[in-house]
């Protein structure tokens, strides 16, 4: 096992600035990819001096990954594959296929960053995972269809769903505004004050009546 200092976060291994022990083959990959340096005495001393800078850089990369995740969430991921009438593919969709699709859309996503929860051997809708950062994995929807006409129907269906969701949100917002305006313009309830006034009047009348009765009573 070799000790390396991680220059960036690596999922399942550690965060930027941490020292990790890995097999020689994996160490060579990390070193070549610029994700780690050898944990020599000099490098460890240098790490202690630059740890704050490394953490700042990691936070910056995480923020960038969050932006990519938001952008990816708005994409319509569709792969066209030949299949039998019952939807069974002639082959399967691989992580390389998804990586190429994302690259064609302008995202630099390597195959090793893509994973599936199941093997994709039929047409349909699937969840796929894309690792954008050691602390961030985006879950996306992938549609696998037989031909371009089906792909277009999927695009229209997604667009329709998005329009319906937007319309529902606008209606809900309008209802909230109307309810707030109605509440602000509601008259103050004076019934309680009126009732108190009537009760006070009745009390005064009863008191006056009792006094009259006492005056009319003959003396004995």
Curated annotation (Swiss-Prot):
One Pfam family per UniProt: Ribosomal_L9_C
InterPro entries reported for this sequence: Ribosomal_bL9, Ribosomal_bL9/RNase_H1_N, Ribosomal_bL9_bac/chp, Ribosomal_bL9_C, Ribosomal_bL9_C_sf, Ribosomal_bL9_N, Ribosomal_bL9_N_sf
Gene Ontology cellular component terms for the protein in this record: ribonucleoprotein complex; ribosome
Residues covered by region (Disordered): 167-220
GO BP term (any one): translation
SUPFAM superfamilies: L9 N-domain-like (SSF55658), Ribosomal protein L9 C-domain (SSF55653)
Biased composition regions of type Low complexity, renumbered to the chain: 167-184
Compositional bias per record (Acidic residues), positions renumbered to this chain: 211-220
Alphabetical keyword list: Ribonucleoprotein, Ribosomal protein, RNA-binding, rRNA-binding
GO molecular function per UniProt: rRNA binding; structural constituent of ribosome
Family the entry assigns: Belongs to the bacterial ribosomal protein bL9 family.
Entry function: Binds to the 23S rRNA.
This protein's name: Large ribosomal subunit protein bL9
Species this chain originates from: Anaplasma marginale (strain Florida)
């Amino acid at each position: 096992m070799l000790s390396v200092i991680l220059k960036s976060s690596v999922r399942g291994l550690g965060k930027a600035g941490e020292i990790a022990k890995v097999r020689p083959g994996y160490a060579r990959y990390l070193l070549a990819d610029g994700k780690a340096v050898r944990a020599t005495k000099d490098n460890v001393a240098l790490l202690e001096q630059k740890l704050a800078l490394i953490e700042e850089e990691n936070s910056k990369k995480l923020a960038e990954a969050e932006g990519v995740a938001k952008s990816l969430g708005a994409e319509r991921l569709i792969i066209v594959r030949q299949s039998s009438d019952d939807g069974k593919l002639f082959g399967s969709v691989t992580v390389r296929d998804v990586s190429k699709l994302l690259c064609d859309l302008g995202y630099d996503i390597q195959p090793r960053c893509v994973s599936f929860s199941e093997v994709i051997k039929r047409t349909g809708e699937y969840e796929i995972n894309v690792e954008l950062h050691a602390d961030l994995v985006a879950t996306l929807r992938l549609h696998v269809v037989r031909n371009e006409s089906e792909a277009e129907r999927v695009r229209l269906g997604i667009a329709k769903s998005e329009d319906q969701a937007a319309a529902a949100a606008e209606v809900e917002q309008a209802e909230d505004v109307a309810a707030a305006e109605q509440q602000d313009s509601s008259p103050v309830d004076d019934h309680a004050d009126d009732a108190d006034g009537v009760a006070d009047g009745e009390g005064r009348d009863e008191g006056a009546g009792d006094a009259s009765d006492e005056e009319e009573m003959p003396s004995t």
